Amino acid sequence: DNYFLVYKDEFCYNKSYSNGYPMGTIKRLNSFDKAVVTTLYICFKLKNNVSINIDYFEQYCESGIFNKELVKIANEGGRAHGLLNVTPTDFFNMHMRIPCIAEQNSIATILVKACKEIELAKEKLANLQSQKRGLMQQLLTGKRRIVEQ
């Protein structure tokens, strides 16, 4: 009873402050088919009859633009155990300005591609760091020697 079942492509607003997210964060479930979250979250899905690109909305949420609206509805000094005092009613009454669907699609395509490139770069960095650790172990313990030419 104290949990919500969230399905793929639905969103959750975490009202907790975390590093880089002073007004909490809105995240899309896209790595799993479903998940369970505490009722402290505000969960929602985009309406079918609204012209909004889900990837655009995800990037919009990630950008922090919503913080300007969240500041208006979060009660001053209304933190309880690190949670912002944001009601679902106030949350769903927030306004957002969005461009036409064609522009949303273009923006989403560019930003999703950029995110994929960043992920590939992170993977490459992790692989290089792993290789370096392996080389350090071999070189610094004498398991591998450098031959002067």
Regions found by a protein language model. Give the residues of each.
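Sequence-specific dsDNA recognition surfaces
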Residues: D1-N14, G20, K45-L46
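Amphipathic alpha-helical coiled-coil/heptad-repeat segments
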Residues: R97-Q149
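Short aromatic/basic micro-patch
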Residues: L5, S51, N85
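Short, ligand-facing micro-motifs at secondary-structure edges
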Residues: Y13-N14, S18-T38, D55, Q59, ...
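A short glycine-rich beta-alpha junction/loop motif
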Residues: K34-L40, N75-A102
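Ligand-binding loop in jelly-roll beta-barrel domains
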Residues: L46-N53
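Short amphipathic alpha-helical coupling segments at ligand-binding clamshell hinges
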Residues: N53-Y60, S106-I110
